[in-house]
């Protein structure tokens, strides 16, 4: 992963491949952001005018490269847009800083070192720039650049491999010896490392990432970071009566798993349970998805990846809260052994579910995990899942839905998500939609009314949450996997959606700010 340093050098004297400065969109043209003073001085105070001549406006996402002035050690200056000049002087939005830093880091792929002279006068600004740059520098290259066995044996394979991400981010303008700055940057580094691990998991092809191999990754990470890991294999799931997880996974040749991760702090007063949907490949099962809808279904375990990353991050940060993660892992495949539409499953809770559509499988594995998590009486449960296409239709590709059995908890999660830069929107759980899941055969069906499908799924999950436990459901079907061109710090492919929200929730819980 990209290295991060708090540089003691100034922008003018830093030896790097490039210097990054921020430019805001002013009424009369581009306006240089704080942090760019030394670079502007090297241009005799005319950097903004030069950028305007080159067509730069300071709009968000805009990037302009130009040769550095003679007074700078770095050969290139990268000016990145921050959007409109803030109403309050120097009060740049943290998300604007993240996105700008990410845009610059992506543009500097292949470089060894870049100095980031973006606004970093406050601890919060420095952390935002660090996060954005590290997230933007991410690249998934595990399956690229291998040996070409068709090439002549004496040929040298130059330039065949992928360009490596920016190797080092040197943060300028921060205070390297200040404990608060150092702590904030160390937090950013730990957080981004785990977000990128979640991205790697989402991007890994399903022939290599399946329930057993995912469980192995979790086990190894647990040993490294002091997280207890328990893996229930197929035999243990049968013995325990986990009918939902087993029912979804029974059509696959590779069996399902339920993984429990437990981080505990000796002085913790609260326990937070996180539950993640981990369908490592979703074909739809017997209710097979149509052509054109299968290619990205390796991402259907993004909820489990987010939960895994959040628990490990909490452990790495030493948060004073107990955090338990439950990864409900299965492949949803058609076969002679697969669950059929019309089958009835007996869930871990004891309830029976009539399966009307085997492509509504995520709620089945989550239901078992929610019941199991509820048995431990946590103070709150949050589940995360790429659950419904209906949520994507409602909110688009960049916003996740937040549902809950407690309005205050739903509001808190929405506000936390917005605070950390993850767009979200509170969604209702209308009681009148519950009747659509009535079954003449079982206690409940796994499908209901077509309209409001995302809300129906939330109502289904609510049935499996223990009494008196605050619960929220994050449907990340839209933002979990980005199929378009990269933007800001968001890459193509797995995004690590919801990790930042879950970690901030754990921090708030540890601080006693929630409940």
Curated annotation (Swiss-Prot):
Belongs to the peptidase M17 family. Mn(2+) 2 binds at residues 277, 282, 300, 361. SUPFAM superfamilies: Macro domain-like, Zn-dependent exopeptidases. It comes from Streptomyces griseus subsp. griseus (strain JCM 4626 / CBS 651.72 / NBRC 13350 / KCC S-0626 / ISP 5235). It is an enzyme of class 3 (hydrolase). InterPro entries: Leucine_aapep/pepB, Macro_dom-like, Peptidase_M17_C, Peptidase_M17_leu_NH2_pept, Peptidase_M17_N. It comes from the Bacteria. This is Probable cytosol aminopeptidase.
């Amino acid at each position: 992963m990209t290295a991060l340093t708090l540089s003691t050098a100034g922008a003018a004297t830093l030896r790097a491949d490039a210097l990054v400065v921020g430019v805001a969109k002013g009424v009369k043209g581009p306006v240089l952001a704080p942090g760019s003073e030394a670079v502007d001085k090297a241009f005799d105070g005319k950097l903004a005018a030069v950028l305007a001549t080159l067509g730069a406006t300071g709009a968000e996402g805009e990037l302009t490269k130009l040769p550095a002035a003679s007074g700078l050690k770095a050969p290139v200056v990268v000016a990145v847009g921050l959007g409109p000049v803030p109403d309050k002087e120097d009060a740049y939005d943290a998300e604007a800083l993240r996105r700008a830093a990410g845009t610059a880091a992506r543009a500097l792929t292949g470089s060894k070192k870049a100095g980031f002279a973006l606004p970093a006068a406050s601890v919060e600004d420095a952390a935002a720039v660090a996060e954005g740059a590290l997230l933007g520098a991410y690249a998934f290259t595990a399956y690229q650049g291998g040996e070409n066995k068709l090439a002549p044996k004496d040929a040298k394979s130059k330039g065949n491999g992928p360009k490596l991400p920016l190797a080092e981010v040197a943060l300028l303008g921060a205070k390297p010896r200040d404990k608060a700055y150092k702590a904030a940057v160390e937090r950013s580094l730990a957080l981004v490392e785990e977000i990128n691990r979640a991205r790697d998991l989402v991007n890994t092809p399903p022939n290599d990432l399946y329930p057993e191999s995912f469980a192995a990754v979790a086990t190894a990470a647990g040993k490294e970071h002091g997280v207890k890991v328990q893996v229930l294999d197929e035999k243990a799931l049968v013995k325990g009566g986990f009918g939902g997880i087993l029912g979804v996974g029974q059509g696959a040749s590779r069996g399902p798993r339920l993984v429990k991760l437990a981080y505990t702090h000796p002085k913790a007063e609260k326990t937070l349970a996180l539950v993640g949907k981990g369908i490592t490949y979703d074909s739809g099962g017997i209710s097979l998805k149509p052509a054109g809808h299968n290619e990205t279904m390796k991402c259907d375990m993004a909820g489990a990846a987010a939960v895994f990353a959040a628990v490990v991050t909490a452990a790495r940060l030493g948060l004073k809260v107990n955090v338990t993660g439950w990864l409900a892992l299965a492949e949803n495949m058609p076969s002679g052994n697969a669950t059929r539409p019309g089958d009835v499953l007996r869930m871990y809770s004891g309830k029976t579910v009539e399966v009307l559509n085997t492509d509504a499988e995520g709620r089945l594995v989550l239901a078992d995990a929610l019941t199991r998590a509820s048995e431990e009486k946590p103070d709150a449960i949050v589940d995360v899942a790429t659950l419904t296409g209906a949520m994507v239709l409602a909110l688009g590709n960049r916003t996740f839905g937040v549902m809950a059995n407690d309005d205050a908890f739903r509001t808190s999660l929405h506000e936390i998500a917005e605070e950390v830069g993850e767009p979200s929107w509170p969604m209702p759980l209308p009681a009148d939609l519950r009747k659509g899941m009535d079954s003449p055969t079982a206690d409940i069906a796994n499908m209901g009314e077509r309209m409001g499908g995302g809300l129906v799924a939330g109502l289904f999950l609510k049935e499996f949450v223990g009494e008196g436990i605050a619960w929220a459901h994050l449907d990340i079907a839209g933002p979990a996997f980005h199929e378009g061109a990269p933007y800001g710090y968001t890459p193509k492919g797995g995004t690590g959606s919801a990790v930042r929200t879950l970690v901030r929730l754990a921090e708030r819980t540890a601080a006693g700010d929630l409940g």
